[in-house]
Amino acid sequence: MSKVSKTAMPAGAGRGAAKKELPEHFKSYKHVWVFVELERGQVHPVSWELMGTGRGLADRLKVNLAAVVVGPEGQHTRNAALEAFCYGADLAYLVSDNVLSDYRNESYTKALTELVNTYKPEILLLGATTLGRDLAGSVATNLSTGLTADCTTLDVDADGSLAATRPTFGGSLLCTIYTLNYRPQMATVRPRVMPMPARVMRDAARIVVHPLGLVEDDIVTKVLSFLPDRDAETSTLAYADVVVAGGLGLGSPENFRLVRELAALLGAEYGCSRPLVQKGWVTSDRQIGQTGKTIRPKLYIAAGISGAIQHRVGVEGADLIVAVNTDKNAPIFDFAHLAIVSDAMQLLPALTAAFRARLLPDSRARIAV
């Protein structure tokens, strides 16, 4: 169904004779769709990030960009469809029904599958969130098409095929994957992998309302109660402007307090590399990298982190990366903007003291006394 290039290559490279003529019944599939994730009345930011990426793909293909909004009847759902036009949508598809009040795989899969079969997009993008991953897999299965998960780059090749690049083999390789002979071409992207596009006020264009035709008795799964994710309420790591993170170079779990102290002083979020989660030093909601969170802060300070590719793919969107490591050959220095060869155990307290003196001059006076 999907073809994988063995190494990261330019879009379209390495396919050769493997590409077959697209079956006739798929040639009518046109346009780029982005699924707008709406939960508890709020649009997940990854949806707007994907709208920016989708806009670029649609422009290169010379087709329309459409937003797909699925949710309960009411103003929140319609507002999400209207807001999509401010992020580049040419039209929006709206499925609004009270059986969609809570996310359930059965009802949402039916809604999105029906939309695809009726209006036939060539590309369908979803956020790689808990909801998006669950929905994308079931929709791709229903449609018997390919799905590339957790992409880091999306492009179109000279033939107009979607070239979806993602890490593989534990992050040691980047593979470009094509869904050659099936439609739609589906991909998911994690939050913060793509930049947030500028919001531009635009008049609403066309909204296509599609009836669901599903009643509550048709759905096996019932939602009895909703418990908010504790981590989602207490951590804003993925969308923080400043992030301080630590790795194994800190030496012990007790020393991780140096990361927390600097982050607290800067009003920043703190994170860590995967080994610290594996050792139980830090909870998994603070992990940064391929299997954790992707971040795009204005400033990222990495202390005692080697910078393997699994970590790199989660941080390389940062505006400024400051890396601290005792090993001058550490991989993180290959992509850091500022490399400091030093012991994090000595540098972090010095940085904290310097920032405290600069940001809190009263504390400097008290120390002098």
Curated annotation (Swiss-Prot):
GO molecular function, one term: electron transfer activity
BP-aspect Gene Ontology terms: fatty acid beta-oxidation using acyl-CoA dehydrogenase; nitrogen fixation
Keywords for the protein's UniProt record, in alphabetical order: Electron transport, FAD, Flavoprotein, Nitrogen fixation, Transport
Domain of life: Bacteria
Positions contributing to FAD binding: 299-327
CDD domains hit by this protein: ETF_alpha
Subunit-level organization: FixA and FixB form a heterodimer.
Family: Belongs to the ETF alpha-subunit/FixB family.
Functional note: May play a role in a redox process involved in nitrogen fixation.
PANTHER family per record: ELECTRON TRANSFER FLAVOPROTEIN ALPHA, ELECTRON TRANSFER FLAVOPROTEIN SUBUNIT ALPHA, MITOCHONDRIAL
Protein's name in the database: Protein FixB
Organism: Bradyrhizobium diazoefficiens (strain JCM 10833 / BCRC 13528 / IAM 13628 / NBRC 14792 / USDA 110)
Originating gene: fixB
